[in-house]
Every structure is written in C-alpha cells, then in structure tokens.
Amino acid sequence: MLRVRPYRPADADAIRNWIRDEREHALWCANLIDYPPSPESLGKKQAELNAEGDGTLFTVLDAACRPVGCFAVMRLEPRINNAHLGFILLAPDARGRGIGKKMVQLAVAYCFGLLGADTVTLKVYEQNEAARYCYKAAGFVDVAHNESSLMFGGEKWGTWDMIITRKRRNRFLPL
C-alpha cells in the first residue's frame, strides 16, 4: 500500500539518496533544483510551486511509512482544465516492482479526483525509457516528441510529451 502526503523538509535526505549521479539528477528535474538536492533547494522549489497556485511537491510512503517516491503537481491550467506532473522520482530499491506505476496512478487520481482536471500531462526525457514505460503502463500516451530540450554532457536530450484523459484513466485505474 502506498500513501501520499505533502513534501516535508525531512524528506530531502531520502530524495538526495535516490539520485546516484548528476545525469540521474538531470533526468529527474532538468537541473531546475540544485544538485545534490537539499532541504533548502527543495523548499525553494516548493515555494515556487505554491506561488503558481495549485503546485505542490508530494512524498510517497510505503506501508511502513518510509519514503519511496516523490512527484509534483506543477499547475492546474483552468482554460483547458489540465494538471501537469513533474519531478517524478522513485527510490532505486523500489524500481522494477510496479511501485512506480502505482505512484503515478495515485498522482493521476489526485489530479482527476481532488483537482477536477480533465487531462493530466507530463514530460519525460527520451533517455529515460524506464520512466516512459512506467507512464505508459499507468495509462499515459505519447502526444509529441521534442528533439532538443536539454544539453547534458555534450548530449542533446529530447522529450516526450505524454497525456492521460479521464476516460483513458478509467481503463487503467480501479479506483
């Protein structure tokens, strides 16, 4: 069983430990949060998200109340009733066991259920195939590919824009 709660500064140590190197850090946050993440840099990002309105960071806990993941709801766009997910990260020891899929489904349920969004979007770097596979397993589909979104270590990283709708979510989520 997974639980979701708002991010707390005490979660920063766990998040920092999930990121093994600068490449993994860039895949997670596009370098929008300092490396390595600290309570201060995560707190700053939380404040920025809060200032945008519906944005917030969340921590995902396992049955033993141990942090195993995090994500952010970055905005609710009222014009098109869309919520956007970002900063999705899973503890290395939780990967490959379906926990990421469940975490993403909980994030989607929050957006549809509590925020009333009609669609939920996210972006994923093309180099992060495991994450893209997880998002597809949770019901997201590709809508666009952007050739060059970030330069890292001499590489151009493209992104996939992905979306899930209420109707599609109902086929993937038994909530």
Task: List the predicted regions and their residue ranges.
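Extreme N-terminal starter segment of soluble prokaryotic enzymes
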Residues: 1-2
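Acetyl-CoA-dependent GNAT
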Residues: 6-12, 17-95, 104, 110, ...
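Glycine-rich acetyl-CoA-binding "A-motif" of GNAT/NAT acetyltransferases
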Residues: 65-69, 130, 156
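C-terminal "cap" of GNAT-fold acetyltransferases
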Residues: 83, 118, 125-129, 148-175
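Glycine-rich phosphate-binding loop
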Residues: 98
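Conserved active-site alpha-helix within GNAT-family acetyltransferase domains
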Residues: 101, 126-144
